[in-house]
Design a protein with these regions (language model features):
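Beta1-alpha1 glycine-rich phosphate/pyrophosphate-binding loop at the start
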Residues: 2-75, 161-203
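FAD-binding core/adjacent interface of flavoenzyme oxidoreductases
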Residues: 2-6, 73-172, 176-185, 251
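Short glycine-rich anion-binding loops that position phosphate/pyrophosphate groups of nucleotides
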Residues: 16, 112-115, 256-258
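A Rossmann-like FAD-binding core segment of flavoenzymes
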Residues: 30-34, 71-91, 102, 178-276, ...
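FAD-site-proximal beta/loop scaffold in flavoenzymes
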Residues: 124-147, 237, 244-249, 253-313
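Short, electropositive alpha-helical surface patch
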Residues: 161-178, 207-212, 307-316, 344-354
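A conserved FAD-binding loop/helix module that cradles the flavin
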Residues: 165-167, 295-337, 341-344
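C-terminal auxiliary extensions adjacent to catalytic cores
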Residues: 347-385
Length: 385
């Protein structure tokens, strides 16, 4: 289909990037693949929610990609992306020794986003759980060492791009910590608080899901403070537009924006700071340059996610369009917009599914918890074996 001289460069080594590698090989594209990332490990972030309870450790959710890269004949370049130039054909990479220039024929950008830290006191007085396994372990250790007190959990968004939010995991941390404390016989010593600036938190999951999540909080005796924007986080409290909420431990998932290196480029940007893409995951105005996952801003429904499963779907579409281009055809594959989420609580889960045809929410049951664990094992098998 293509010559072996075709060089496909992938920036990042997360969900979207690795799915792109697999799809390229699955479609038998005869191309050299170079992956650029700071390390050759995958952290399975969806399972971070099990770290506070000890159901998962950092080692459990870490995958060494050395064998995967060797099997898929991938050249891995350890480094940080500094710049992308020449409409995607040139990438500047900062390695341990120097900044090098790497050229390509096709580029896939999948470096992820970064959490906004503009909320005063966030960096000093709160933990952003999904920043990595070290934060998951920190949450575990902090709660283990507490004899009681108030744990407050909430999330925010990017006001210029409301889709750039990680609400689902915060519901899982909330319910999971509640379950853990009950299993430990310590729940009566703790006050759990959920706070959010919206009066309908988690709207991306659908109205029925929001109702169900709020109902679950009330059932679990979780104090709900919604509809007032957080103004700052202090050492012992959250200050909102309406009130002050005392807290001994704060977990807060802020909204996301694009990675810092984008500021060095001429890549088209959305108002929220992401790379502007079309429905085929093409970077607008940059030929043979694609973006998948959290780094991009895409057309689609207001509930469109960008991470994990959706990043996989975008990577599949991007590679299908690359195959078209290399064969001299017009790219014809739009990415599928689909949201699948199991809101887990350590021993049970609530299933949420959305696409352009339907929105489905199924009540909590043990089957969904085990389904989430099965999917974790199935997903990681491709990279561990």
């Amino acid at each position: 289909m293509t010559t072996s001289k075709t060089h496909i460069m992938i920036l990042g080594s997360g969900f979207g990037a690795l799915t792109a590698v697999r799809e390229i090989r699955k479609k038998k594209v005869r191309a050299r693949i170079t992956v650029v990332s700071p390390n050759n490990h995958l952290t399975y972030l969806p399972s971070l929610i099990w770290m506070p309870s000890g159901l998962r450790s950092a080692a459990d959710i870490d995958v060494d990609l050395t064998k995967f890269f060797a099997r898929e004949q991938v050249d891995w370049l350890k480094g940080q992306v500094v710049n992308v130039r020449d409409e995607g054909r040139t990438v500047d990479v900062e390695t341990d020794r120097e900044t090098i220039v790497v050229t390509n024929d096709v580029l896939i950008i999948a470096t992820g986003g970064r959490y906004l830290k503009k909320l005063p006191g966030l960096a000093e007085h709160a933990i952003i759980p999904c920043e990595g396994a070290t934060k998951g372990q920190l949450i575990h250790d902090r709660i283990r060492d507490m004899e009681g007190g108030t744990i407050a959990m909430g999330f925010g968004t990017n006001p210029k791009e409301p889709q750039a939010v990680r609400g689902g995991p915060m519901f899982e941390f909330l319910f999971g910590i509640d379950t853990m404390l009950r299993q430990q016989g310590r729940r009566d010593k703790f006050r759990l608080v959920f706070f959010n600036g919206s009066d309908r938190p988690g709207q991306r999951l659908g109205p029925k899901a929001v109702d169900g999540l709020l109902r679950e909080m009330w059932k679990r005796d979780i104090s709900v403070h919604i509809g007032a924007k957080p103004l700052r986080i202090e050492a012992d409290r959250i200050v909102t537009e309406r009130e002050e909420i005392p807290a001994d431990l704060v977990l807060f998932m802020s909204g996301l924006t694009g990675p810092l290196w984008l500021d060095n480029t001429d890549l088209p940007r959305s108002s929220g700071g992401f790379i502007q893409a079309d429905e085929k995951c093409r970077v607008v105005g940059w030929p043979k340059t694609y973006v998948v996952g959290d780094t991009g801003s895409y057309p689609g429904p207001e509930w469109l996610a960008k991470q994990a499963h959706q990043a996989d779907l975008q990577a599949e579409a991007a590679v299908a369009n690359i195959v078209d281009e290399l064969a001299g055809r017009e790219p014809s594959h739009n990415f599928k917009a689909e949201l699948i989420c199991i809101v887990d609580s350590v021993n049970k889960g609530i299933l949420v599914f959305r696409n352009h045809k339907m929105a489905l929410t199924l009540p909590k049951c043990r089957v969904f918890h085990w389904a989430k664990r099965f999917f974790e094992r199935h997903y990681l098998k491709a990279y561990r074996n």
